[in-house]
């Protein structure tokens, strides 16, 4: 490995390697050869683009073997890097030796043609080798790093919250149950139903839908914290935007109100998008050309815009007065649909916008009740192209109000005793938000289906690979 040069280094520092002998290793993407010479496109995984290798029958002792190698065979190449400013590629490697590391079978599914995303989902173990998914998952990696960098540079503490939980943060009940009981013959409680006291944890336990409640504990000790981990929703939603397993970024900030919350959300979103654009120009150019023609313009617009702000009540009025006929009629009290959110950002504000102060009946129990008694200090960040990308709120710090809200929603206080206890010991104003990581990657890449931005998607009826 020591003497192998990564393809990324060759592209980023071409002049440093010009006219010098280099060694690369990678997989064959394309190969064409005549009796005298041939061309191989090699990708080593370190960079989106391939390297063209030129091999000559007069120099390569195993020329006949190499010229017949199937796509996806792995090879090592030793040769001289020659700059080619007048060609499509900035340089090529003129091979002196080619070593076959591993032969690929001739029935390799990813041949040199454009495959549909639907087909590629059926071979999720191989699709990272395709151009679109090579670009997608490299962007995913860089975006994840950018999120950590943003919060670390701001002094936030990275906090790991539990995957297994006995509480439902959203109060929606759409959770995956975790049990070691024999479900063919489970123990039955005296009052009927399954006796979870005999289960592994001694109570009903589920996969987490959010790390927020646990994150609040740490925010009230470390001031500013964030989580970044997998979450699970048992929603039977077979849509392009829903998955049963996905990743969430959830910062929590003490001594911070809703205004502070929106400021951090806006800064984070702009930072991550700009970071990916700077670090992955080849990938973004690919998406802009082949996936979403207006992508680059839209991303630049988000980065360079000052986000708008409007209350839910004002937004409803604007939509009603727009004269637009929506599939879902707009009236106060409804949860805004994607068509409403996109109309606000694309037609009315023509930029990203925060919608604040939603009706309490469509929001979670932990959101701070406003003085009007009807709305809560919640915010959703809407962006052109998709609508909601971030959801957050100022948290309810008043113990009596929080208890009353839980009673309204028939939530059992005993399940949240520790969360309620936070309000007894130095409670303060605090806020936070959640960003679905896959939703962000869809936005940055223009990919239209959440199944195509997760390495191995888990959706209704699908748990392959």
From Swiss-Prot:
It is an enzyme of class 6 (ligase). The keyword Protein biosynthesis applies. Gene3D superfamilies: Bira Bifunctional Protein, Domain 2 (3.30.930.10), Nucleic acid-binding proteins (2.40.50.140). GO terms for cellular component: cytoplasm. Keywords: Aminoacyl-tRNA synthetase, ATP-binding, Cytoplasm, Ligase, Nucleotide-binding, Protein biosynthesis. CDD domains: AsxRS_core, EcAsnRS_like_N. Pfam families: tRNA-synt_2, tRNA_anti-codon. Homodimer. This is Asparagine--tRNA ligase. It comes from Clostridium perfringens (strain 13 / Type A). The lineage of its organism: Bacteria, Bacillati, Bacillota, Clostridia, Eubacteriales.
């Amino acid at each position: 490995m020591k003497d192998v040069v990564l393809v990324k280094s060759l592209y980023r520092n071409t002049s440093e390697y010009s006219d010098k002998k280099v060694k690369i290793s990678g997989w064959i993407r394309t190969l064409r050869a005549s009796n005298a010479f041939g061309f191989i496109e090699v990708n080593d995984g370190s960079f989106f683009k391939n390297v063209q290798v030129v091999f000559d029958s007069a120099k390569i002792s195993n020329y006949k073997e190499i010229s017949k190698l199937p796509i996806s065979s792995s090879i090592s190449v030793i040769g001289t890097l020659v700059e080619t400013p007048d060609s499509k590629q900035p340089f090529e490697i003129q091979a002196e030796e080619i070593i076959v590391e591993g032969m690929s079978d001739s029935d390799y599914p990813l041949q040199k043609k454009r495959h549909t995303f639907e087909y590629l989902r059926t071979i999720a173990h191989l699709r990272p080798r395709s151009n679109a998914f090579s670009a997608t998952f490299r962007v995913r990696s860089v975006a994840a790093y950018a999120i950590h960098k943003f919060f670390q540079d701001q002094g936030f503490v990275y906090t790991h919250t539990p995957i297994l939980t006995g509480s439902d943060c959203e109060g929606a009940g759409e959770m995956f149950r975790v049990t070691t009981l024999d479900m063919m013959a489970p123990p039955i409680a005296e009052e009927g139903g399954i006796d979870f006291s005999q289960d592994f944890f001694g109570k009903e336990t589920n996969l987490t839908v959010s790390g927020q409640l646990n994150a609040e504990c740490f925010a009230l000790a470390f001031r500013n914290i964030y989580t970044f981990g997998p979450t699970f929703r048992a929603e039977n939603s077979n849509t392009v935007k829903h998955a049963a397993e996905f990743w969430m970024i959830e910062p929590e900030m003490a001594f911070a109100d809703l205004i502070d919350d929106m400021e951090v959300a806006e800064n984070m979103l702009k930072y991550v998008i700009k970071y990916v654009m700077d670090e992955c120009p080849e990938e973004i150019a690919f998406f802009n050309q082949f996936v979403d023609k207006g992508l680059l313009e839209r991303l630049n617009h988000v980065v360079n815009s000052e986000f708008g702000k409007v209350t839910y009540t004002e937004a409803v009025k604007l939509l009603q007065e727009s004269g637009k006929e929506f599939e879902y009629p707009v009236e106060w009290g409804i949860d805004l649909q994607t068509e409403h959110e996109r109309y606000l950002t694309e037609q009315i504000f023509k930029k990203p916008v925060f919608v604040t102060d939603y009706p309490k009946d469509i929001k979670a129990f932990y959101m701070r009740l406003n003085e009007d008694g009807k709305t809560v200090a919640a915010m959703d960040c809407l962006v052109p192209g998709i609508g909601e990308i971030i959801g957050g709120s100022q948290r309810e710090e008043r113990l009596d109000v929080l208890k009353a809200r839980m009673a309204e929603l028939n939530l059992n206080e005993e399940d949240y005793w520790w969360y309620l206890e936070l309000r007894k010991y130095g409670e303060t104003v605090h806020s936070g938000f959640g960003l679905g990581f896959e939703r962000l990657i869809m936005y940055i890449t223009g990919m239209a289906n959440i199944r195509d931005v997760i390495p191995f998607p888990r959706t209704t009826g699908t748990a392959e690979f």
